[in-house]
């Protein structure tokens, strides 16, 4: 088992930095090679259990929060939309505005691809441009909802797919991975009610791939 990159741990919660290309939880095709399995093995040695609060896409890296009992899991999930969830992303092209809020209804097709529709579930995604190079933009993203592939589908719809995202027709793969990383999470601790901020910078290759294309 690979060593977990633990950002924070106490008696109630655990925050881990998930690497890209690792599932958060099991699927029909893969049950073992998941972050959940690694965390469960780690906590089993301490006679503790683990409960999934949320998940990241397989190709997205960054902060994932786990609870250590079902009551805490429910408390965290009930307040999830109140928490601050921020990402850093590298997208193709220049954004239409330096800062904007994208409000779309999202649906999922039979191939599990999410797309913008007049029906579907409402989503709210905020972005702010941090830097640009000749072909891409580095942006900060904050989500107000928690729809599947929300960031990826919304940015692709406005013509700025995340680099490396073949599922949403990205043509650039400058990072040799999906250009999306969950770098900031602010919650209220379910027991102490204290506000807690967790930070986790993207891997070096994330920024090196972007800088390579600057003038």
For each feature predicted by the language model, list its residue ranges.
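RNA pseudouridine synthases
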Residues: 1-215
